[in-house]
Amino acid sequence: MKTELDLHDRSLTLHRFPKRSNETLQAWDAGDEYLINNVEGMALPDNQNIVVVNDNFGALACWFSDRHNVTLMSDSFISHKGAQQNLADNQCNQVSFLSTMDDIPENTDLVLMQLPKSNRHLVWLLSQLRKTLPASCPIVAVNKAKEIHTSTLKLFEKYLGETKTSLAWKKHRLVFSTANAQPVIDVDPMTIWGIEGEGIQLKNLPNVYSGESLDLGARFMLQHLPQDPTLKHVIDLGCGNGLLSVKMGQLNPQARLTSVDESFMAVESAKQNLLDNLGDARDIQCIANNCLDGFTPDCADMVMCNPPFHQQQAITDHIAWQMFCDAKQILNQGGKLLVIGNRHLGYDAKLKRLFGDKNVKLVASNNKFVILQATKNPAKLGAKQ
């Protein structure tokens, strides 16, 4: 796996986050290289104020901080940590960090953007750029050519302004746009909907997974969450909008709830939804984090999760494995990990490898999903503590 980005007689050493000894995926892609080549061709004067949006692991921030003032905007906690790691490893100049819910800096001279996967997130970003930037500020976005559709360009033209595209290079294409669309369209960042029969209403910020409707996996999981008066602390890992946390809170009013996600928007949505549906007297905590980094061992009675199989644009199963390993670490003896996943992902084999064959059972299944429960071995009588 290549870790050296070599362009224009410069070299950067870049790693994904968290670093893994057996990593097979690069920390940058051809889209980053295309943006770098394009901006280098502009021959910008030094000390420009550059805003980089959705910089996956900081390749662009590292590159441009050499001569410019860089602000990195991302909804991803992992992107922030990866960029910080790579900036430090390459002894780069200081970079400012913002989430994509923060205001666009007003003194921006150039915006560079990796296009987000979610159209809701894209529309939010375009509307914020239009509200803040002068028409003189160039905006250059990039994505795989096959992901830039006519509908994508229409969103640019509607919410941002005049837009054109480049030729394809290494299967990527640039999008050049100007903040001059009329009229300026105000976009509400929050999408709100309820779940029939559950008495739950959910607020969803633009980059929340399945933020416009209840996904099938969550609907299935809702039917199989336990009511257990012995539960003192429940963790919802990869919480999204916090739906499972809310339901567990309704079923188990005695339980302390911790909701964790790597998306800042997911964490804020979960916080709002827990407060709205359970009230402000409950013991709840919502945290942006890389899985369960920094959690105290043996601190929870139950962890529930629906692991993602994407990290940024890449398909990978290492996140699920990290979630399972972290959950085992922080569960009490006898604590339970409740997992939902697509049938084809084979989570049962991973869980049996980690928890032992006899400690993993099938809770429920349908033609698409399985729900599995893994129990951390209870301490044996007479065992050394």
Swiss-Prot record:
One of its GO terms (molecular function) is 23S rRNA (guanine(1835)-N(2))-methyltransferase activity. Its EC number is 2.1.1.174. Keywords: Cytoplasm, Methyltransferase, rRNA processing, S-adenosyl-L-methionine, Transferase. It comes from the Bacteria. Belongs to the methyltransferase superfamily. RlmG family. Specifically methylates the guanine in position 1835 (m2G1835) of 23S rRNA. This is Ribosomal RNA large subunit methyltransferase G. The gene is rlmG.
